[in-house]
C-alpha cells in the first residue's frame, strides 16, 4: 500500500524528525511504501511530490502545529499528534492501512488527537484531552515561549 505522511512540531528539530523516522521504519517493516515530509521552524524537508500524493492510498499527519490539508482533498487523512508518530508509529500505519482497505475517505483523528471520530490508536491520553476540551481555557502546548528556539534566535540576532 502507498502512504504519505507529514510530521510537524513547533520547533521542528527533534520530535518531528523522530516521528518521521519511526513512520518510515514502521511502514517498511509492515511492507508498505511510505514517503514522509517534515515541517519545522527551518522550513520543509523531503516535501511530498504531487505524484506521490495522487498515488497515495492514505495520508498520515502527526502534527502539533497547523498543517494545510488542501493538497490532500479526496484522500483519507488520519490526524494525530507528533507523540503518536514517535510512540505509536506502527499502530498509526496499521490504522491507515485498515481504513484505506475499508474504502474510507475524509478526515479521521486518532490517538491523542483532539476531536476525532476514531481514537483507539494510542488512546491512553484520551481522558486528558476530554477534560481539556470541556474547559473554556485554551490548551497550551510546548514550553516557556521565552526559552524556545525563536526566543533564542531573536536574542542572537538582536
Swiss-Prot record:
<dbReference type="InterPro" id="IPR050864">
    <property type="entry name" value="Bacterial_PTS_Sugar_Transport"/>
</dbReference>
<keyword id="KW-0963">Cytoplasm</keyword>
<feature type="domain" description="PTS EIIB type-2">
    <location>
        <begin position="1"/>
        <end position="98"/>
    </location>
</feature>
<dbReference type="InterPro" id="IPR013011">
    <property type="entry name" value="PTS_EIIB_2"/>
</dbReference>
<feature type="active site" description="Phosphocysteine intermediate">
    <location>
        <position position="9"/>
    </location>
</feature>
<keyword id="KW-0762">Sugar transport</keyword>
<dbReference type="InterPro" id="IPR003353">
    <property type="entry name" value="PTS_IIB_fruc"/>
</dbReference>
<keyword id="KW-0808">Transferase</keyword>
<protein>
    <recommendedName>
        <fullName>PTS system fructose-specific EIIB component</fullName>
        <ecNumber>2.7.1.202</ecNumber>
    </recommendedName>
</protein>
<keyword id="KW-0597">Phosphoprotein</keyword>
<dbReference type="GO" id="GO:0009401">
    <property type="term" value="P:phosphoenolpyruvate-dependent sugar phosphotransferase system"/>
</dbReference>
<dbReference type="Pfam" id="PF02302">
    <property type="entry name" value="PTS_IIB"/>
</dbReference>
<dbReference type="InterPro" id="IPR003501">
    <property type="entry name" value="PTS_EIIB_2/3"/>
</dbReference>
<keyword id="KW-0598">Phosphotransferase system</keyword>
<keyword id="KW-0813">Transport</keyword>
<keyword id="KW-0418">Kinase</keyword>
<dbReference type="GO" id="GO:0016301">
    <property type="term" value="F:kinase activity"/>
</dbReference>
<feature type="region of interest" description="Disordered">
    <location>
        <begin position="104"/>
        <end position="147"/>
    </location>
</feature>
<dbReference type="GO" id="GO:0005886">
    <property type="term" value="C:plasma membrane"/>
</dbReference>
<dbReference type="InterPro" id="IPR036095">
    <property type="entry name" value="PTS_EIIB-like_sf"/>
</dbReference>
<feature type="modified residue" description="Phosphocysteine; by EIIA">
    <location>
        <position position="9"/>
    </location>
</feature>
<dbReference type="GO" id="GO:0090563">
    <property type="term" value="F:protein-phosphocysteine-sugar phosphotransferase activity"/>
</dbReference>
<feature type="compositionally biased region" description="Acidic residues">
    <location>
        <begin position="114"/>
        <end position="136"/>
    </location>
</feature>
<comment type="function">
    <text>The phosphoenolpyruvate-dependent sugar phosphotransferase system (sugar PTS), a major carbohydrate active transport system, catalyzes the phosphorylation of incoming sugar substrates concomitantly with their translocation across the cell membrane. The enzyme II PtfABC PTS system is involved in fructose transport.</text>
</comment>
<dbReference type="GO" id="GO:0022877">
    <property type="term" value="F:protein-N(PI)-phosphohistidine-fructose phosphotransferase system transporter activity"/>
</dbReference>
<dbReference type="GO" id="GO:0005737">
    <property type="term" value="C:cytoplasm"/>
</dbReference>
<feature type="compositionally biased region" description="Basic and acidic residues">
    <location>
        <begin position="137"/>
        <end position="147"/>
    </location>
</feature>
